[in-house]
Amino acid sequence: MKSFNLLSLSLLLAIASAAAVPDVEGTITNDAATPVNNLDDKRDHCGQVCLNKTGCGGKCPKCDMRSLTCKKA
């Protein structure tokens, strides 16, 4: 049982230390996974959900308040 506790503790420490590694200069980060970038990318598509007149842009700048979707002007 003692060896199991030691093994599980060392595994836990290995996972925690791997998660705490800072970003290394020169590596590529995946910014596309951030919600802000996803929203900016989707602003250009028709049919996205909008809640006000400023929620749409690009090819479909008009927000139809009945269906709450962006449509072409």
Swiss-Prot record:
Disulfide bonds join 46-60, 50-63, 56-70. Residues 1-20 form the signal peptide. The keyword Disulfide bond applies. It is found in: Secreted. Coiled coil: none annotated. Its main location: secreted. The keyword Disulfide bond applies. GO terms for cellular component: extracellular region. Keywords: Disulfide bond, Knottin, Secreted, Signal. The presence of a 'disulfide through disulfide knot' structurally defines this protein as a knottin. Belongs to the UPF0499 family. This is UPF0499 protein NFIA_054990. It comes from Neosartorya fischeri (strain ATCC 1020 / DSM 3700 / CBS 544.65 / FGSC A1164 / JCM 1740 / NRRL 181 / WB 181) (Aspergillus fischerianus).
